[in-house]
Regions:
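C-terminal beta-signal and adjacent terminal beta-strands/loops
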Residues: 790-800, 822-875
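N-terminal plug
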Residues: 38-85, 90-92, 103, 108-114, ...
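Transmembrane beta-barrel wall of Gram-negative outer-membrane proteins
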Residues: 203-345, 365-375, 584-587
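Signature of Gram-negative outer-membrane beta-barrel scaffolds
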Residues: 303, 425, 429, 436, ...
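A beta-strand signature from Gram-negative outer-membrane beta-barrel systems
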Residues: 110, 122-168, 208, 215-220, ...
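Gram-negative outer-membrane beta-barrel transporters
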Residues: 660-665, 682-799, 872
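Membrane-embedded beta-barrel scaffold of Gram-negative outer-membrane proteins
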Residues: 385-391, 395-406, 456-457, 468-472, ...
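Outer membrane beta-barrel strand-and-loop segments of large Gram-negative receptors
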Residues: 24, 419, 431, 437-441, ...
Length: 875
């Protein structure tokens, strides 16, 4: 398939060029004076006309109208894009692993523990100048291009000095002013910083930094006194005791400013943005698991849960720019810190254990940090245009004191602490990832006679990601003086108190690397990619534009698990995948009218497994409360992409488009949900044999000025904007196909038909995506109001562990939002006020399994409606 597609693209380019040459060299008739005047795309916006690809563009005005708070939310307004878990973007139904996110053209590191794709909820809207969503591949972009590439563009230096300050408050019907779960934590939690309360216990740092917490000098362990000092050094009540408090309002603060000025050496500019957000969200819902039962399903566990989360986010951006003649150099520095403080109670009934009732209590703290520095430049050197950029980025994720403890409930309601296995977990995990990248692009206008215009682009790119993730797990167990009658009913802070530790009533055990928590306590992962490309973009004939390119990529992707106490020793497991690809791409644009054009695209691309999917380290997904574990035997996915789109532009920012697309996928990656011995779902990944995906997109946006004789109506411009995407997919399975699984640490190759029958939809793909915006704007009054409707149809969230069991299905449903903005002046100062109402339909989150007329909710919860007020001033 690869060789065939490449041959077709090259042959097509040769034929097109030859045809153009013949047409251009045919001599005119004698005595005839021919003067050709061509107006090409006069009504087509510059940003659309400048690209040869099928693309969407998200402007600052679009984000302001929708009132979206971050990049992930804003992108859901774009045709064919859906959002999963509030932070991961799916393009045309393809998971986040197939959608590359860039910042000013450079790749980004991710702070997610087992994931290489960055969650886009980290990027506040205030730092963005716009976003390009390119849906057809071009050779100047990375070859990891399944659904598309999302290029976030940060704000640049201003033409004139400004200072803008904004504040906001908000809340939701499930959380604000209600009595909800939380825990004390530390005194500086409200700032998103821990004051040292959650630091790795001093006893561990002093006595067991490079060895497990084990008593016994014969095994290199600790003395009894050292062991008890370690156990006593764990923070107790501030992190263990859950309580209920009345929830406050959410708060927002933004400040930004910039200035540019001329010097003898050129024009200099600077900009700075600082943002702080503090919000609370409660989820109350149901989590059920199932087992097969006479061709249908039966309930295995039935749990209700209540979770409350406090999210505190800081972000800062600084930019410097220098321009002189045909030279421009720009520096961008970005810092983002996002902290989540979570408390959760789960009341679980296990049907298989005689309806035994267990309460699980969780307290968690997650810190995610992104730091990035980028230096870039553009220069005109004679007939050549040189563009370059270098980026260094670092992300870190710390999860200290992930606390889980369980109590059993008797028929009379008495609580009994469960002290076996992993029922009293305390976990510490740290992730660090570094990324370095460099890009050089050269463009040259070719002096050729057989085409009207032609530009040659060549370039090279390099990228290296390196990641280290470590995790230590501890549990409390019965000591030699344990008396269940006296101690099993104690509150958690009394149960694990210094007194009980000193008296050998309770003991601390380390589980790091044990079978109870996963064998990979430490893993390293890396990806290094080197690439070069050549691309020609030309006006082949009047009104006909073609772009063809080839990209060569070579990559090494490595994952290895290490002994956390002897990291320099030989790896426990190591696997490196080295692959080379030649990736062709071609697009053709026919501008057959001054306001209309047709685009066609054909390309081959790839998708690499993410670290989350490769690393054999267990990780609890806090969104679903499931354990995830990677499969180090995953392989790359390859794509053949075909696109076509018709575009009609009425005016600036007003258009109608219709498109169709087809993708053939070899070895797509799917998520598999396996029911564990404890009745809980565990999730891993595998390569399905193949899949086809195809669909269509339509979008329309227009502003109307009405003449009704009614002043209130006639003084406003009325907006109608809608887009709809239909996508369908089919997994393809043949007899003899096998898959590779790594569920128990030993790879197996079962027949693919044990898990797939063929014809199933791809995991994460929704058949229907729709967005509707209805609103008005009044330039005189400075007001703008918009209703936003978003609909996402059902999608498979994870495959079941057997073809006889139904898949897990998510039902996002329809949401209706309302946003109102108005400008006004106070003593000559310009202010903007805003009001936002979200999820007016009260749509809840639903995930379920259904069979035999029965439905079981695997992860469903209430979301509620949210409301906010904002005020900003410009100085």
């Amino acid at each position: 398939m690869t060789r065939t597609l490449r041959t077709l693209l090259l042959a097509g380019a040769a034929l097109t060029t030859a045809h153009s040459a013949l047409a251009q060299t045919a001599p005119p008739s004698e005595g005839t004076e021919v003067e050709e005047i061509i107006v090409s795309g006069r009504f087509i916006p510059d940003v659309i006309r400048d690209t040869a690809e099928v693309a969407n563009f998200l402007s600052v005005e679009d984000v302001q109208r929708a009132g979206d708070d971050n990049a992930a939310q804003a992108l859901t307004r774009i045709t064919g894009i859906s959002l999963v878990s509030g932070k991961f973007v799916y393009v045309r139904g393809l998971g986040e692993r197939y959608s590359q996110a860039l910042l000013n053209g450079s790749p980004l590191p991710s702070p997610e523990p087992l994931q290489r794709v960055i969650p886009l909820d980290l990027f506040p809207a205030s730092i963005l100048a716009g976003t390009v969503i390119q849906k057809t591949f071009s050779a100047n972009y990375p070859g990891e291009f399944g659904g598309g590439v999302i290029d976030l563009q940060t704000v640049g230096t201003p033409d004139e000095a400004f200072l803008k300050v904004g504040v906001g408050i908000g809340g939701d019907t499930e959380t604000t002013a209600e009595s909800r779960l939380t825990y004390y934590g530390s005194e500086t939690d409200w700032l998103g910083f821990d004051d040292g309360t959650r630091k790795l216990p001093v006893g561990v740092r002093q006595f067991a930094a490079s060895r497990p917490v084990v008593v016994g000098s014969a095994t290199g362990g600790l003395t009894t006194d050292q062991y008890k000092a370690v156990a006593r050094s764990f923070t107790n009540a501030p992190l263990n005791v859950l309580q209920r408090d009345k929830m406050p309002l959410n708060g927002i603060f933004d400040i930004s400013g910039g200035q540019s000025f001329d010097t003898d050496y050129g024009r200099l500019g600077a900009i700075g943005v600082l943002s702080y957000r503090n919000g609370w969200q409660t989820r109350k819902g149901v989590r059920q698991t199932t087992v097969p039962d006479s061709g249908g399903l039966a309930l295995a566990t039935d749990a209700t849960f209540e979770a409350n989360q406090n999210d505190i986010a800081w972000s800062g951006l600084g930019g410097l720019a220098w321009e002189s003649g045909d030279n421009e150099v720009r520096y961008t520095g970005l810092w983002i810190r996002s902290t989540s403080k979570r408390a959760r109670i789960t009341s679980n009934t296990a049907q298989s254990q005689g309806n035994a009732n267990v309460n699980a209590y969780n307290s968690e703290w997650y810190e995610r940090v992104l730091q990035l520095s980028q230096l870039s430049g553009k220069h005109l050197i004679g007939d050549w245009e040189l563009a370059w950029r270098g980026t260094y980025g670092r992300t870190a994720r710390q999860a200290p004191y992930e606390r889980l403890y369980r109590y059993g409930l008797s028929a009379t309601g008495a609580s009994t602490a469960l002290l076996s296995g992993a029922n009293q977990l305390v976990s510490f995990s740290d992730l660090d990832e570094n990324i370095g990248s460099a890009n050089v692009d050269l463009a040259y206008d070719l002096p050729v006679d057989f085409v009207r215009q032609a530009q040659l682009k060549v370039g090279a790119a390099w990228q290296r990601n390196s990641r280290t993730s470590v995790r230590r797990d501890f549990t409390y167990d019965q000591g030699r003086n344990w008396d269940p009658v006296r101690y099993a009913g104690q509150r958690i802070d009394y149960l694990v108190s210094d007194r009980n530790i000193n008296d050998d009533i309770i003991l601390l055990r380390e589980l790091t690397g044990s079978s109870l928590t996963g064998d990979a306590a430490m893993y390293d992962a890396g990806l290094e990619v080197a690439a070069a490309y050549v691309q020609v973009d030309s006006e082949i004939r009047p009104l006909l534009r073609g772009s063809i390119g080839l990209r060569y990529e070579t990559a090494d992707q490595t994952v290895k698990t290490l002994d956390i106490f002897s990291p320099s020793a030989a790896p426990i497991f190591s696997r490196t995948v080295s692959k080379d690809y030649v990736l062709p791409a071609a697009t053709l644009t026919w501008n057959f009218a001054e306001d209309q054009q047709l685009r066609f695209g054909l390309s081959q691309t790839i998708g690499r497994p993410q670290f989350r999917e490769l690393a054999p380290q267990r990780y609890r997904d806090t969104e679903t409360d499931r354990i995830l574990s990677g499969n180090p035997y995953l392989e790359d996915t390859t794509f053949v992409n075909v696109d076509a789109r018709y575009e009609h532009y009425f005016s600036k920012g007003q258009y109608f488009t219709f498109g169709a697309f087809y993708k053939n996928m070899e070895k797509p990656i799917e998520a598999l949900a396996v029911l564990g011995s404890d009745g809980a779902f565990r999730q891993t990944f595998y390569n399905a044999p193949a899949a086809d995906i195809y669909g269509g997109e339509v979008e329309f946006k227009k502003l109307f000025e009405l003449e009704t004789g009614t002043t209130w109506v006639d003084n406003r411009r009325w907006l109608v904007s809608l887009n709809y995407t239909y996508t369908t997919s089919q997994l393809k399975v043949s007899d003899g196909d096998t898959i590779i699984l790594d569920i128990t640490g030993v790879p197996t190759t079962p027949p693919a038909r044990d898990y797939l029958t063929g014809g199933e939809k791809l995991q994460g793909q929704s058949d229907h995506l729709a967005n509707l915006q209805l609103g008005f704007e009044n330039d005189e009054a400075g007001s703008q109001a918009t209703f936003l409707v978003t609909y996402t149809s059902e999608r498979v969230s994870a495959r079941s562990s057997s073809v006889d069991l139904p898949d897990l299905v998510q039902k996002p449903g329809m949401r209706v939002d309302f946003v109102y903005r108005r400008n006004f002046e106070i003593q000559g100062r310009e202010f903007t006020g805003s009001f936002e109402a979200r999820n007016l339909t009260g749509t809840d989150a639903e995930e379920y399994q259904a069979a035999g007329g029965k439905r079981f909710d695997t992860n469903s919860f209430d979301i509620g409606q949210s409301f906010s007020l904002g005020l900003s001033a410009r100085f």
